[in-house]
């Protein structure tokens, strides 16, 4: 799966599944034994600190430090090769137990996003209305320009991404493009509540007008607010 992978985290990528499963367990096998002494949740907090985590891993693989490599909870003194091999094995077991045959998994099968609404935290509201939108398969990850990061405690559920994507032409502000994760309206019954979701998920954009004349000439409807 990794040998033939082009490094692109597309929805149909099998290599992306293998890479991220191995990466999660690699980080766990290197750091978790030491971090557990700081209390529950310490490893999750460390994993969320992307820059620190990435720099630490680079330092280890560049040979600048081996302080974290050995598992302090075992008698054996592990080498980096031991940790890497264990991470491959752990990743395979994790994927097989949770999803079935790892060789058949595609990134979009496991890496998914639900645009959650706070009101859905109430089980009754969720059952009656369900303000949330999703789930949907999502390409990319925290390691790509198309940001879609997941929590290590719940791989591979997307927990964060871009709140808006926008392209600005500074020579012509009316020649811009933008897209939102769900829609322009926060009103649940509005046709614009979730009408941008599929485009956002596919990495597409909508024209973004800036000047009054451009907006007025391309409008499809008009909403007027009147005070009383």
Regions found by a protein language model. Give the residues of each.
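Long, compositionally biased non-active-site segments enriched in small/hydrophobic residues and glycine
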Residues: 1-228
């Amino acid at each position: 799966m990794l040998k033939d992978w082009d490094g692109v985290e597309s929805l149909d990528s099998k290599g992306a599944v293998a890479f991220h499963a191995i990466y999660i367990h690699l980080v766990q096998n290197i750091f978790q034994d030491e971090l557990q002494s700081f209390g529950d949740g310490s490893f999750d907090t460390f994993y969320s600190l992307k820059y620190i985590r990435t720099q630490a891993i680079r330092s280890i693989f560049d040979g600048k430090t081996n302080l974290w490599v050995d598992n302090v909870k075992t008698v054996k003194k592990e080498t980096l090769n031991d940790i890497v091999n264990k991470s491959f094995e752990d990743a395979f077991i994790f994927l097989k137990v949770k999803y079935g045959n790892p060789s058949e998994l595609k990134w979009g099968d496991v890496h998914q996003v639900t645009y959650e609404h706070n009101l859905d935290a109430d089980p009754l509201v969720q059952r009656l209305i369900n303000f949330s939108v999703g789930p949907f398969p999502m390409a990319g990850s925290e390691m790509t320009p198309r940001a879609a990061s997941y929590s290590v405690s719940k791989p591979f559920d997307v927990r964060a991404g871009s709140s808006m994507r926008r392209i600005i032409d500074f020579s012509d502000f009316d020649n811009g493009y933008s897209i939102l994760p769900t829609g322009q309206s926060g009103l649940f019954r509005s046709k614009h509540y979730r009408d941008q979701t599929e485009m956002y998920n596919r990495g597409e954009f909508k024209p973004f007008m800036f000047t009054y004349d451009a907006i007025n000439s391309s409008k499809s409807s008009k909403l007027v607010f009147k005070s009383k």
